Amino acid sequence: MSAASFLNIFSIVSGCFPVIAALYNYKHLDKILKIAAAFFLVSFLVDLGLFFSMQLVERNNYPVLHFFVLISIMFFVAIYYYAFFKTTLKKTIVVLGLIAILISIFNLVFVEGIWEYPSISNTILNVLLIFFSLAYFYQLLNKQEFIHIEKQGLFWINAGVLFYYAINIFLFMLFKQLLNTHKEVYMINYITNIIANILFTVGLLCKPQPQKTI
């Protein structure tokens, strides 16, 4: 088995880590972490389904990726909507999410098409989540009261989001070119996915700390 194949399989398996953590710590999860846990379950099932479909059928699975991008946008809009305190930020999250969904649907229908890899939609998702995660860190670090950020479950999940999407943004943008010339570069995605899933797992094992509106 090649290193790329091993990392691919381990990357997929690592997707069950946050799911198991959520089941183990479910009674301690607040609304935000439950939404995040639901997304991780969907993400794991999609990755698992894509892997087996490629192994057994070897058919074009890009339509699934297009719809998964849309699902990801909706989940993360919900997560960050509840994570932010200020009404203006909540409204901004919703507006940007709707714009991202409309662009992704337009791309799916008129630009790249449903049978091509969603580079544009994935790039939009990456930019959106990098902005959301940086804004959340800004809110977290500018609270007026003292908090242990390492005990905040969403801190770890947000760190995983920023880590994964900030590193992979250029990989998703250039996926079509890299697919034919530098397939080994995609191992970056496998490694970052494993690390992100570990961060998500840590976050879901945290007991939510009380948060005060500022």
PLM features: residue spans?
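Terminal, non-globular segments
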Residues: 1-214
